[in-house]
Amino acid sequence: MSPIFKLRTVVTTLVLLALGYVALWYTVGFRTQKEVTATLAQWLDSGMQVRHGDIRLSGFPYRIVIEIENLDVSTRARGLAVETDQITLISHVWTPDHWVVQSAGNDISLADGAIVLFEEFLQASYRMHDGDKLVVKIDSAGAADARIRRPTGLPPLTQWSLLLGKDFAEVVENAGLYEKRTLEFRFFADAGDSTLEFTGGVSGPGLRDWTVSELANWRDEGGLLAVDELSWSTGSLQLKADGDLTLDENYRPLGSANLSATDWQTAARLLSQFGLRISPNSSAETSLMLQSGLALIDGAEVAELGPVIR
């Protein structure tokens, strides 16, 4: 076989491979663009409010990039509302179950406006494991630009991250006292000289909105918020808690937790900003009860609790 023929064979093979990859990229890219458009349409058909601008495909040849302009998604009663100037979804042809998301100009409202956060830049990753286990990570990308619009007394956040896990596998039967958790989470926030870490899970039916009917259904069907660990560190204070929470008939927090603190004087001073009247002489380890619209530590009232929905 002559060298010229060998060269032609190699070149022809490379050209065919390149054409095949181009065809594959555009097939996967256009299919993904259609799936994103269809998903937004399904959200709208399900009763959510969805508005958006252009949906564009780019990224050839290395990545698949979907850009969505001016995306505004909220539940019907706006219990959850997210507005972004631009959201970008990034993946590759060979990793269809793993997406990286970058979002700019984010306005986020949670729990009927109980928490309203503005974040200039967010990044997230979406990965499906074994076909039915979803893991989502959202973080501030190290940028200290988070602003909590509703006053809370909290210092400005320098960085934060939220890890969510959901198992879509069907439950054959319930085992033990508690139902399988429908959502696992871990939240971490850094405010310079203070850190907050919150890990736990939620069981019961999923909340489709922050409304009386949805919360009542979640409560009546055994909904439970499990606090595996809540840890707050600032200066000489390290405050920890773990427990379980649900709602009473008037939609007020109901449950109990174990509390421990290294410095109750500092804890009493800082928590007074949130309306908690804690004794600076509390035991190093104590208990918290939430019942009948009251928060009690060792039987002493420290705060009144209102409903979680107006």
Regions found by a protein language model. Name each.
Residues 8-310:
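Glycine-rich, small/hydroxylated-residue low-complexity segments
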